[in-house]
């Protein structure tokens, strides 16, 4: 399986690509506007099955594309690769958080999620997830937390659930349709505020669910 990580030179994208690379099961392509920078990041992660390319070249032939760029660049990046992307599934991990007096919040709580807006500009299914995981946690090992995934396409969501489950020590849980991304992105703002207040890298755990 080939996974393209757009924004793979950033903190979260690089950490995610590194964790997938450590599993040794996937071909990882770091995508960036700057191919040389992407390749430098790939080399830093150990090379081998990790390579670097422009965003457009990274998505070609990939089985999953992770949109890990900053929130304010996500839609433009998605538009820029839409032609090369075709109907390949996209995993949206970004949240548009703004800070006012040190408190993080969504710019417009009543607006559609970034994941939903991404679905407007690409032909393939968009899945949202992994919002609550801190890059610092992925840098070290599988964090002791759960992660939530949502989307409307069953096959694409199952693929992301399988992959996400390999990144955390807890569980990757199906949180419903893509519309649930509004809640997931909002919850991320709360987690960011908690981590800033307590100087931590906390995640979430969902209790009371049956095993399996």
Language model segments and positions:
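NAD(P)+-binding Rossmann beta1-loop-alpha1 motif at the extreme N-terminus of oxidoreductases
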Residues: 1-44
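Hydrophobic Val/Ile/Leu positions in short beta-strands of Rossmann-like dinucleotide-binding domains
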Residues: 5-6, 67, 149
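Short, structured coil segments at secondary-structure junctions
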Residues: 24, 45-48, 86, 122, ...
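Rossmann-like NAD(P)-binding element
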Residues: 49, 55-89, 98
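General beta-strand structural signal in soluble alpha/beta enzymes
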Residues: 52, 126-130, 172-175
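Rossmann-fold NAD(P)-binding glycine/threonine-rich loop
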Residues: 94-134
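Active-site-lining helix/loop region of Rossmann-like oxidoreductase modules
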Residues: 137, 145-212
């Amino acid at each position: 399986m080939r996974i393209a990580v757009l924004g793979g030179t950033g903190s979260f994208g690089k950490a995610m690509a590194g964790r997938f690379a450590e599993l040794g099961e996937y071909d990882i392509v770091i995508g960036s506007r700057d191919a040389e920078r992407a390749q430098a990041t790939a080399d830093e992660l150990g090379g081998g099955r990790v390579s670097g390319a422009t965003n457009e070249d990274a998505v070609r032939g990939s089985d999953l594309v992770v949109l890990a760029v900053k929130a304010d660049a996500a839609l433009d990046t998605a538009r820029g690769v839409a032609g090369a992307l075709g109907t390949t599934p996209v995993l949206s991990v970004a949240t548009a958080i703004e800070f006012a007096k040190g408190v993080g919040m969504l710019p417009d709580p009543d607006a559609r999620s970034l994941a939903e807006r991404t679905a407007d500009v690409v032909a393939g299914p968009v899945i949202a997830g992994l919002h609550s995981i801190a890059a610092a946690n992925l840098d070290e090992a599988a964090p002791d937390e759960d992660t939530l995934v949502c989307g409307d396409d069953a096959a694409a969501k199952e693929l992301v659930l399988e992959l996400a489950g390999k990144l955390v020590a807890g569980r990757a849980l199906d949180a419903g349709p893509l519309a649930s991304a509004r809640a997931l992105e909002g919850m991320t703002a709360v987690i960011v505020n908690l981590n800033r207040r307590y100087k931590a890298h906390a995640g979430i755990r969902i209790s009371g669910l049956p095993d399996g």
